[in-house]
């Protein structure tokens, strides 16, 4: 239900999110879920005590935000129904673009500083590990590129083969995308082979319907999905 005293704008405020989900996974999942409504400019989620279970998503268009609020109200996201409304304050990215940005107050800055320190303390130390830009950045395996494989010409199948996924993709992130289409059954991922997944539907017609709009969908800007029918 839209909040009457908050005028429609490009940012939406989301509550009742699962607090056990890690921040980066939460942001990626929200991006995947809400990209269907329009271009997303920013996703903000902090894990400080006061801001847990909340997030903000900013679209490039007000109409996209409106569609998202109406259609995703009470949507079960990580086993909890989301509560959505328009955000009260303009997002930083919009304010900067319009030249009206005012820095956050000291208290908010301090909260973000504490959050960054907490994340840094939990991040594994890679100082002596392989260079992030070196050939071993992905355990010696080159990052997948957007190259269609021969499997794109496979005959229709009720199982889709997904390639070029970011290695941090989770089954829940994919489920949020593919369960929007009728006949969805399950996601299958292989731990030993990151970057690929299988999505099963009840029949090959339903699989084809899902394939068309999601072909090339970008979970991250660098990773357009490559979808083909799986081998029978």
Swiss-Prot record:
Residues 100-157 are annotated as: Disordered. Residues 108-122 have a biased composition (Basic and acidic residues). GO terms for biological process: cis assembly of pre-catalytic spliceosome. SMART domains: RRM. InterPro entries: Nucleotide-bd_a/b_plait_sf (IPR012677), RBD_domain_sf (IPR035979), RRM_dom (IPR000504). Keywords: Cytoplasm, mRNA processing, mRNA splicing, Nucleus, Repeat, Ribonucleoprotein, RNA-binding, Spliceosome. SUPFAM superfamilies: RNA-binding domain, RBD (SSF54928). It holds the Pfam family RRM_1. Residues 10-89, 158-232 form the RRM domain. CDD domains: RRM1_U1A_like, RRM2_U1A_like. Signal peptide: none annotated. Component of the spliceosome where it is associated with snRNP U2. This is U2 small nuclear ribonucleoprotein B''. The gene is U2B''.
């Amino acid at each position: 239900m839209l909040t009457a005293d908050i005028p429609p704008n490009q940012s939406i405020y989301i509550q009742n999110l699962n607090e056990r989900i890690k921040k980066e996974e939460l942001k990626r999942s929200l991006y995947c879920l809400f990209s269907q409504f329009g271009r997303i400019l920013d996703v903000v989620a902090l894990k400080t005590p006061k801001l847990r279970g909340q997030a903000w998503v900013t679209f490039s268009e007000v109409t996209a935000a409106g569609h998202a609020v109406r259609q995703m109200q009470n949507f079960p996201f990580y086993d909890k129904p989301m509560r959505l409304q328009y955000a009260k304050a303009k997002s930083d990215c919009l304010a900067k673009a319009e030249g009206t940005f005012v820095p956050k107050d000291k208290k908010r800055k301090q909260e973000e500083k504490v959050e960054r320190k907490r994340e840094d303390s939990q991040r594994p130390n890679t100082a002596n590990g392989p260079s992030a830009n070196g050939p071993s950045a992905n355990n010696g395996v080159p990052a997948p590129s957007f190259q269609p494989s021969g499997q794109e010409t496979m005959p229709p199948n009720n199982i889709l083969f997904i390639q070029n996924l970011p290695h941090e993709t989770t089954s829940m992130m994919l489920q949020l995308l593919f369960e929007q289409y009728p006949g969805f059954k399950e996601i299958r991922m292989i731990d030993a082979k990151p970057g690929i997944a299988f999505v099963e539907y009840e029949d090959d017609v339903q699989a084809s319907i899902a394939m068309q709009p999601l072909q090339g969908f970008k979970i991250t800007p660098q990773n357009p999905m490559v979808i083909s029918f799986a081998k029978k």
